[in-house]
Each structure stands twice: as structure tokens, then as C-alpha cells.
């Protein structure tokens, strides 16, 4: 990846808290300009710590981070001015109006007043009609929209969203997905952490998986699905079986509890999938089937498998 394509570069990043807890372990990560990167990981995996270090909220124990070439330690103000952060918590002054909140946020970054930009921003977030209302009067979903408006008030190039749709209803979640895609189309680089696998599957260009402070992988979503996703051939039988036919007993075939379905798991990228051999073996055994279809592993299954393998490796280390 060339320097012009990389907007955030993380090298050897580590964080050990005073308690001795190691939140991050030598993380290396390059974030591409204009992409949506989703960071997946269970609670306590290190997602929020990673974001907090990049945004200058938490000091790293080791390693280096640059934002558009600016070191987050030596050039803190320049690096931070390029970043907008939407935290998990609803952190707003409840007695301020929506307009006062976003105006103050813009001023804190030393940006001159720009009423036209802020009006456009609030309209895009369906907040313009609420601009004179106090924060305490807004619903939880609207308060979260205000957090996004605050983060974008100083016109950053990069937006971090830490669990952006936690606690919001499905309709609002999909509205926010659409808004995030619009921001990406305008050139904003977006990094989000999420517990919702569907959210990452819906929006991300690339996906990173983090577990126990280690970045397990970062890959294009389509490539990840293709490389790690298993395919299954699902064979609906004409007559139930009591056991697997001898000819397929050594293959990756399972018989469902009701005996009515055979499930064959295979690597779709392999030179030989074995599907043809399986079907011929069943025909020789006189097994008749009424339907055959296939399915691809979901991102959720891939994620669960990666985290499970990581935990097993740590347990045996």
C-alpha cells in the first residue's frame, strides 16, 4: 500500500495499563484513505483502546501512530484536527441546544464559524428541525445523531465510530448505515467498531478481527468471505437414513438427526471440491434425493471461528 493510499499507519502498538493488563500487543495496521474499515472483536478485545490511542485519548506503551503523516505524539494537534470521534457513551451537555453543541465543537478545533456547513450537516442527519431543542429533550437515537454531528462539525477527514448503533432500533440503525455510506462517498475515511456482524457485513470495505489485544487479520470483505468461508452442499433425501452410507463415511458428510438431510462441507476454492464424487457415491449406494442446494458461511460464522481458534491457540501456548 503506497503512502498516498494510507491515511493512518499503526506500527508495533502496545498498551499495558498500571494494573498490568495488556490491552494491545504489537498491533500493526494500515488504514486506507476513503475506506470503511470495521473492527470486530468480543468485549475486552482491545477495540476501544486502539481507537482511543489513535485519537489521542490514551497514551500508548509502545509503538507509533501517524495520521496523514502526522505523529500523534509529536504533532498531536494536527493529527487530532483530522479526526472526528463518536464515542460509545452519550456524552453531551443536556442543557445545551443542538445548535450550541455543534457550534462549540467546531470552535474547539479552532475552525471559523460556518453556518452553511453546520446547517447542511444537521439537515443530512435529520437534526435541523431539532436545532433549537435542548439535548435533554431528545430521544436516545437523536442524541446519538448529535454525537455524529459533533464529530463532523470541524470537517474531519477521518471518522471513528465506536459501537455507533448500540442501543438504537433497527430502523434508525439502517438510517445510520445509509448516512455512513454517504460520508464515505464524500471522501471521509470511516473506522467503526461493532458487535453487530450484520453491520460489518452491510457496510465495510475491509474487516479487521481483534481478540485479546492481538489483531488476527485485516482483509477485504469479499476476499475474507471467499478465502475463509466454507461452502455446504445440502442434500434433501427422498427417504430418511438411519446411518451414513459406507461409501461416504470417510468424507466430511454429516447426517441430520432426523435422517432426512446430508450436509457436505467443502472448500470452494480447492482444486477438487469432491461434490461430483460424493453424488456419484450416493447414486451407487442407491440413495435418492429430492433436492440439492448449497450455502456459503456467513461472516458471523467466520468471525466466531477465528476467535475460537485464537483462544484455543492461547490455551495451548
Question: Where are the model-predicted features located?
Answer:
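Conserved ABC transporter NBD signature motif
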Residues: 63-71, 78-79
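Conserved ABC ATPase "signature" region
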Residues: 103, 107-130
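Conserved ABC ATPase signature
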Residues: 134-138
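Conserved catalytic motifs of ABC-family nucleotide-binding domains
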Residues: 155
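Catalytic Walker B motif of ABC-type/P-loop ATPase nucleotide-binding domains
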Residues: 159-162
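ABC transporter nucleotide-binding domain
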Residues: 177-267
Amino acid at each position: 500500500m503506497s503512502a498516498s493510499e494510507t491515511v493512518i499507519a499503526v506500527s508495533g502498538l502496545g498498551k499495558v495499563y498500571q494494573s498490568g493488563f495488556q490491552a494491545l500487543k504489537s498491533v500493526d495496521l494500515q488504514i486506507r484513505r476513503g475506506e470503511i474499515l470495521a473492527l470486530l472483536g468480543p468485549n475486552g478485545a482491545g477495540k476501544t483502546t486502539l481507537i482511543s490511542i489513535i485519537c489521542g485519548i490514551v497514551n500508548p506503551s509502545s509503538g507509533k501512530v501517524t495520521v496523514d503523516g502526522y505523529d500523534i505524539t509529536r504533532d498531536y494537534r494536527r493529527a487530532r484536527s483530522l479526526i472526528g470521534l463518536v464515542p460509545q457513551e452519550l456524552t453531551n451537555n443536556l442543557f445545551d441546544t443542538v445548535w450550541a453543541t455543534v457550534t462549540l465543537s467546531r470552535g474547539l478545533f479552532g475552525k471559523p464559524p460556518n453556518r452553511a456547513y453546520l446547517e447542511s450537516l444537521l439537515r443530512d442527519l435529520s437534526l435541523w428541525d431539532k436545532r433549537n431543542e435542548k439535548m435533554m429533550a431528545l430521544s436516545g437515537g437523536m442524541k446519538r445523531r448529535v454525537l455524529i454531528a459533533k464529530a463532523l462539525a470541524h470537517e474531519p477527514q477521518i471518522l471513528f465510530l465506536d459501537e455507533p448503533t448500540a442501543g438504537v432500533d433497527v430502523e434508525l440503525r439502517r438510517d445510520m448505515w445509509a448516512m455512513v455510506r454517504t460520508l464515505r462517498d464524500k471522501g471521509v475515511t470511516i473506522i467503526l467498531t461493532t458487535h453487530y456482524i450484520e453491520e460489518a457485513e452491510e457496510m465495510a470495505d475491509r474487516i479487521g478481527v481483534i481478540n485479546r489485544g492481538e489483531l488476527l487479520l485485516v482483509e477485504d470483505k469479499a476476499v475474507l468471505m471467499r478465502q475463509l468461508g466454507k461452502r455446504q452442499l445440502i442434500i434433501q433425501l427422498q427417504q430418511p437414513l438411519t446411518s451414513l452410507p459406507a461409501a461416504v463415511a470417510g468424507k466430511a458428510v454429516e447426517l441430520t438427526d432426523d435422517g432426512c438431510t446430508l450436509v457436505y462441507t467443502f472448500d470452494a476454492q480447492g482444486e477438487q471440491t469432491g461434490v461430483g464424487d460424493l453424488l456419484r457415491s450416493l447414486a451407487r449406494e442407491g440413495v435418492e434425493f429430492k433436492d440439492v442446494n448449497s450455502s456459503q458461511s456467513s461472516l458471523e460464522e467466520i468471525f466466531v471461528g477465528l476467535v475460537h481458534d485464537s483462544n484455543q491457540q492461547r490455551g495451548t501456548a
